């Protein structure tokens, strides 16, 4: 199973990449929304096949496109059923509740979370 991981904090990115690889997943790490979105496209067309089975996105990202905007952009390109997304974030509980209202079908994990919790979510999203 291939995972696209968007996280701007190098320490968290390294930890999560290593943990996911040790769990048997192939991981492509991205530090910007632009990098992740570019990986989903071939030129101006959607990559076929998609490079990932699941995408994990941090909400709090520097630059012009925060995580929520990246997720909305991905959903414009690809059905959420075709490319599931998991949100990770250190936002406040109130902010995360607002995100859950906006994206009710996207699971949200508040940092810090247990890696086992993330692994269980990924397992639920495995393609059949």
Provide a role label for each language-model segment.
Residues 50-53, 78-84:
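His-Asp phosphorelay/catalytic-motif detector in bacterial-type signaling
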Residues 66-81:
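Short amphipathic alpha-helix used as the core "switch/output" element in two-component signaling
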């Amino acid at each position: 199973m291939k995972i696209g991981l968007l996280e701007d904090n190098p320490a968290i990115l390294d930890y999560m990449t290593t943990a996911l690889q040790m769990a048997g997943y192939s991981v492509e790490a991205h530090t910007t929304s632009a990098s992740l979105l570019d990986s989903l496209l071939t030129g101006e067309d959607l990559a076929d096949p998609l490079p990932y089975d699941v995408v994990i996105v941090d909400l709090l990202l520097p630059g012009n496109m925060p995580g929520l905007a990246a997720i909305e952009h991905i959903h414009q390109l690809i059905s959420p059923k075709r490319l599931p997304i998991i949100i990770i974030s250190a936002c406040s509980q109130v902010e995360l509740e607002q995100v859950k209202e906006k994206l009710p079908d996207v699971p949200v994990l508040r940092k810090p979370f247990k890696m086992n919790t993330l692994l269980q979510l990924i397992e639920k999203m495995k393609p059949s």
